Structure formats: structure tokens, C-alpha cells
Amino acid sequence: MSGNTLGQNFRVTTFGESHGIALGAIIDGCPPGMELSEEDIQIELDRRKPGTSKHATARREDDKVQILSGVFEGKTTGTPIGLLIHNTDQRSKDYSKVAETFRPAHADYTYTQKYGIRDYRGGGRSSARETAMRVAAGAVAKKYLKERLGIEIKGYLSQLGPITVDNVSWPFDNDNEYFCPDKDKQEEIRQYMDNLLKQKDSVGAKISIIAKNVPVGLGEPVFDRLDADLAHALMSINAVKGVEIGDGFAVAAQRGTEHRDEMTPEGFVSNHAGGILGGISTGQDIVAHIALKPTSSIMTPGRSINTEGEAIEMVTKGRHDPCVGIRATPIAEAKVALVLMDHFMRNRAQNGDVVPPVMDLAHPEN
């Protein structure tokens, strides 16, 4: 399995399985001298951890992170940062029947076909449990980006099933169990999820992410465009089936006179491009959206096969999120932070001495 590392100059490698002893991450390329504690990382992990809502998995994990290396006397040393989280609430017996069957719309079948073997307990490496380490690594990137560059990254639940959250403007409050900035919609979501649980079903969701104060110039054309790397990182999140940058798929219905982000001496007139042009950040807000599929781990019977290829009826038991999108916001924020951090490091390495010859249109007052 060779796809466990993200980034080039700021590299993150994760390891571990859902029901293994622990999850871990190695961060290579973090600049030295930044103050970093386990508490700094724990703040982000607590936003993601399971068991915080009746509409999320009932699995209880403290997700207490340990810093194993790369920090001395409270500051990063520039050496690899090792992070570890122990699993404490595995219930592998819930998955005993999954060993010889394939859950529909899960990675069970494809992992078996690719590797000839799989850890069936909780999905093993394919479980969203692994994203705890992405959030932990993202916390390090977030801290650096905010303290050194003033970059803020914040996401929110913009759709859950038929319920949409519209007209959200910065700053917004996402400090609730749904990461929803609209208090009225929070109650609507709560009622919808209660009914969904009674129906033994699940639902999809959409998450929106905004990154503010991103400097102009991040992105490496042509193959490592900033939007390409953001899409790659966000698509690697479990259950994500679509990524949009800026207006995304809505551009198919737009005309050029509407979509083009005109420029004046006072700055950009609009931001349909989502803060990226030609694969390079413009200095405007970077805006991205992800669509997450409904989990197929539900109590409603569905057709599948066993390892002998025989037809079976499958009911997935265990502790699962009826909407995986509810806890996806901190994960999406982390992935955006990791990409921006990597591209900042790459841009600094090559273009650190470049003085932009034209005014900063995103901040014309400067």
C-alpha cells in the first residue's frame, strides 16, 4: 500500500487501522521554532472525535494524542514530528460476520481483490477512524499558517440530505454538533436525523470550506496546481464523491460575462473562481465544497455476496455514523491546511526572493 503520504515539502504519512493498537502519523518538513504542545493538537481532535453526538457513531474514543518526537522544550526542532493515538474502544466482535461477507458500497470487496487479504474489523485501514491522524497533522499546519501568515481555515455543513444552509458569510459560528452556522437549521437537522434513525437509514451531506488571508502565488503549475492538489486531498477523505472549487459545477450554466472575476484598481469584483486562477492562489478567499455519500452501514437489509460468491442478505451491525458528513468538517479543514502548508513551503523554497511587480488585488489597501 503506497498511498499513505501527502505533500512534498511538508509531508505527512499516516499508519494504523480502525481496530489496531494505535494510529500514528509522521510529519516531515515542519519549520523549527514553532511552539507546539499536545493541547494544540487535541483541540482539533476533540472537534472530530466520535461519541460527541447521538447522530454520530456511538464508539467512544478519547483520541488523546502523544507527541513522540520533533518537539523539544515546547518548540518544533525541524526534525520529523511523530504523533500517536491509541485505540481504546474497539468492539471487533461486532464484525465477526463481516469476515466472510462483503458490505455493499464499502471497501471490503476492493481491498480483498487488490491485496488478497483484509482486516475486516471496523474496515481496517479503509475506516474513517484513520482520519484522526489527518486532523492531528492538520492541527500543526493550521497553527503555523495562522501564526505566521494569518491564514484562517473554517468549514461548515452546507447541506444534509434535502436541508440546505444558504447565505453564510464570514465570520460564522460552527461550534455545535453539526458544524452548522444556522441555528434554525440545526433544529431542522436534528429532527430529520431522529426520523432517519427510526427508519434505519443514512443520508449524504455537503461540506463547505473557506480559507482566508491566503497569500497570492501558492500553487505549482502545471501538474501540482493548487486547486488540483486541494481536489486530490479532499477526494481522499472517506465517502467523498465530489469536490468543487469556487462555483464548481455551477459554472456549466454560467456565461463568461457572469463568471469572469473582473479586476479594478480597487480589487477583484467577484470570486467565482474560488480564489485560484491558473492553479495559483489569487489572494482572495479559497472556497471549496465536498459531497459525501450516505454510508451503507445501515440496519436495513441489502443484497450482497460472501467470499464464496454466494448471494446473501446483509445487515451491517456495529456503531456507525448515520451521516458521515456530520463529523467531516474538521477533516476537510485539516486537508486544506495540509495542502496550503505544503504549497507555502514549496513557494518559499523557489520564489522566496520574488517581489510581485503588480499591486495585490485581493488587498489593494496594502
From Swiss-Prot:
Reaction catalyzed: 5-O-(1-carboxyvinyl)-3-phosphoshikimate = chorismate + phosphate
InterPro entries noted in UniProt: Chorismate_synth, Chorismate_synth_AroC_sf, Chorismate_synthase_CS
Assigned GO CC terms: cytosol
GO biological process assignments: amino acid biosynthetic process; aromatic amino acid family biosynthetic process; chorismate biosynthetic process
Cofactor note as given: Reduced FMN (FMNH(2)).
Keywords in alphabetical order: Amino-acid biosynthesis, Aromatic amino acid biosynthesis, FAD, Flavoprotein, FMN, Lyase, NADP
GO MF annotation terms: chorismate synthase activity; FMN binding
Key word Flavoprotein present: yes
Binding sites annotated in the UniProt record for FMN: 125-127, 238-239, 278, 293-297, 319
Superkingdom as given in the UniProt entry: Bacteria
Keyword Methyltransferase: no
Gene3D superfamilies (alphabetical): Chorismate synthase AroC (3.60.150.10)
A Pfam cross-reference name: Chorismate_synt
Listed cofactors: FMNH2
Pathway listed: Metabolic intermediate biosynthesis; chorismate biosynthesis; chorismate from D-erythrose 4-phosphate and phosphoenolpyruvate: step 7/7
EC number: 4.2.3.5
Residues engaged in binding NADP(+): 48
First-level EC class: lyase
Family annotation (SUPFAM superfamilies): Chorismate synthase, AroC
UniProt family annotation: Belongs to the chorismate synthase family.
NCBIfam families listed in its UniProt record: aroC, PRK05382.1
Function: This reaction introduces a second double bond into the aromatic ring system.
Subunit-level organization: Homotetramer.
Protein's name according to its UniProt entry: Chorismate synthase
Organism encoding this protein: Hydrogenovibrio crunogenus (strain DSM 25203 / XCL-2)
Gene designation per UniProt: aroC
